């Protein structure tokens, strides 16, 4: 898969930046109003009852703030957060080590929770439901099961693929929140806030232009701002202006709707080789040289969101909106 400026997935260089930009409270958090308002109520109710917050599942496309919300939940509850991920928990013993290290009320954040192995999920069920851990000591006929009590804790799971979670695991979450793509105005506010942290002057029109091309995703907006800032420092006087922004994004091959060369390759591949579709996913995969799950999970969601692509029982179809974007006429049936 090509390295991608417009990927919502976290890159190595994003880690320190995201930590420094991360809001600490729900009041500071921009966007996701529905999820935020619900969490405010659930957190306040748990604090009034002096209980731990119910387990929370955050799901939606990458880069929308799931990790940030997990940290905010811990801050609002006044507890510590322990962070891990589905791929990092390889054996039941790994999960047991994490669970037994928790303090009362702590938040355990598991990113990519859909990638937990089923055997590990089974260890998690009694931990989530009864705050206890069943472990097997010994082997063979002499093996015996021992139950350990755990302190009450809140599990916050994050996933880009809620449908990949097993039903028993999903049903054990008391709070399910879907994170939606951000509006241009929300992203513009995020870009301006990031500019303040960077101590870089940014024109409000430039912030709006970056927001329009950020695919509804804060992580992408901040990444684009970093690259535009580089152009402003080298090709300008350090101020992020509209002129600098448009020049930088054109050179970075990010068009006015936030589509890049990979989006163009996918859409034009279907248009030019299959008359716009319908065409099967595996055929698209072979045509553009990308794995089918990458196309489905990484490239297609935004194209579906903006109405440039349709998934049908017969395959993928490029819509009239996409033809219009490329200045092309749809083939006559």
From Swiss-Prot:
CDD domains: AAA (cd00009). Its main location: cytoplasm. It is found in: Cytoplasm. It comes from the Bacteria. Residues 256-333 are annotated as: Head domain (RuvB-H). Residues 1-182 are annotated as: Large ATPase domain (RuvB-L). Mg(2+) binds at residue 67. SUPFAM superfamilies: P-loop containing nucleoside triphosphate hydrolases, Winged helix' DNA-binding domain. ATP binds at residues 21-22, 63, 66-68, 129-131, 172, 182, 219. It holds the Pfam family RuvB_C. Residues 183-253 are annotated as: Small ATPAse domain (RuvB-S). Keywords: ATP-binding, Cytoplasm, DNA damage, DNA recombination, DNA repair, DNA-binding, Hydrolase, Nucleotide-binding. It catalyses: ATP + H2O = ADP + phosphate + H(+). InterPro entries: AAA+_ATPase, AAA_lid_4, DNA_helicase_Holl-junc_RuvB, P-loop_NTPase, RuvB-like_N, RuvB_C, WH-like_DNA-bd_sf, WH_DNA-bd_sf. One of its GO terms (cellular component) is cytoplasm. One of its GO terms (biological process) is DNA repair. DNA binds at residues 311, 316. Its EC number is 3.6.4.-. One of its GO terms (molecular function) is ATP hydrolysis activity. The RuvA-RuvB-RuvC complex processes Holliday junction (HJ) DNA during genetic recombination and DNA repair, while the RuvA-RuvB complex plays an important role in the rescue of blocked DNA replication forks via replication fork reversal (RFR). RuvA specifically binds to HJ cruciform DNA, conferring on it an open structure. The RuvB hexamer acts as an ATP-dependent pump, pulling dsDNA into and through the RuvAB complex. RuvB forms 2 homohexamers on either side of HJ DNA bound by 1 or 2 RuvA tetramers; 4 subunits per hexamer contact DNA at a time. Belongs to the RuvB family. Homohexamer. Forms an RuvA(8)-RuvB(12)-Holliday junction (HJ) complex. HJ DNA is sandwiched between 2 RuvA tetramers; dsDNA enters through RuvA and exits via RuvB. An RuvB hexamer assembles on each DNA strand where it exits the tetramer. Each RuvB hexamer is contacted by two RuvA subunits (via domain III) on 2 adjacent RuvB subunits; this complex drives branch migration. In the full resolvosome a probable DNA-RuvA(4)-RuvB(12)-RuvC(2) complex forms which resolves the HJ. Has 3 domains, the large (RuvB-L) and small ATPase (RuvB-S) domains and the C-terminal head (RuvB-H) domain. The head domain binds DNA, while the ATPase domains jointly bind ATP, ADP or are empty depending on the state of the subunit in the translocation cycle. During a single DNA translocation step the structure of each domain remains the same, but their relative positions change. This is Holliday junction branch migration complex subunit RuvB. The gene is ruvB.
């Amino acid at each position: 898969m090509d390295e991608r400026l417009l990927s919502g997935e976290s890159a190595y260089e994003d880690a320190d930046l995201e930590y420094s930009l991360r809001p600490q409270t729900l009041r500071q958090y921009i966007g996701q109003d529905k999820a935020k308002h619900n969490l405010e109520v659930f957190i306040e109710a748990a604090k009034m009852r002096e209980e731990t917050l119910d387990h929370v599942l955050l799901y939606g496309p990458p880069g929308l703030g799931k990790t940030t919300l997990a940290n905010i939940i811990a801050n609002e509850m006044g507890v510590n957060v322990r962070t891990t991920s589905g791929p990092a928990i390889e054996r039941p013993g790994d999960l047991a080590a994490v669970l037994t290290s928790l303090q009362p009320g702590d938040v355990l954040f598991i990113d990519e929770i859909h990638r937990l192995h089923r055997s590990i999920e089974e260890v998690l069920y009694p931990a989530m439901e009864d705050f206890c851990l069943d472990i097997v000591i010994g082997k063979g006929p002499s093996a015996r099961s021992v139950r350990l009590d755990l302190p009450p804790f809140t599990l916050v799971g994050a996933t880009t693929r809620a449908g990949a979670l097993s039903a028993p695991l999903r049903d054990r979450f008391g709070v399910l929140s879907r994170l939606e793509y951000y509006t241009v105005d929300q992203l513009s506010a995020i870009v301006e806030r990031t500019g303040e942290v960077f101590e870089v002057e940014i024109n409000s029109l430039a912030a709006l232009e970056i927001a329009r091309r950020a695919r509804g995703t804060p992580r992408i907006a901040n990444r684009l701002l970093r690259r535009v800032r580089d152009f402003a420092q080298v090709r300008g006087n350090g101020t992020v202006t509209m002129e600098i922004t448009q020049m930088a994004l054109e050179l970075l091959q990010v068009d006015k709707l936030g589509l890049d060369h990979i989006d163009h390759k996918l859409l034009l591949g279907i248009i030019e080789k299959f008359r716009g579709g319908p065409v099967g996913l595996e055929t698209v995969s072979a045509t553009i040289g990308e794995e089918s799950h990458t196309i489905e999970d990484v490239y297609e969601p935004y194209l579906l969101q903006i109405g440039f692509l349709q998934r049908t029982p017969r395959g993928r179809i490029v819509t009239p909106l996409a033809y219009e974007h490329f200045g092309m006429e749809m083939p006559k049936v």
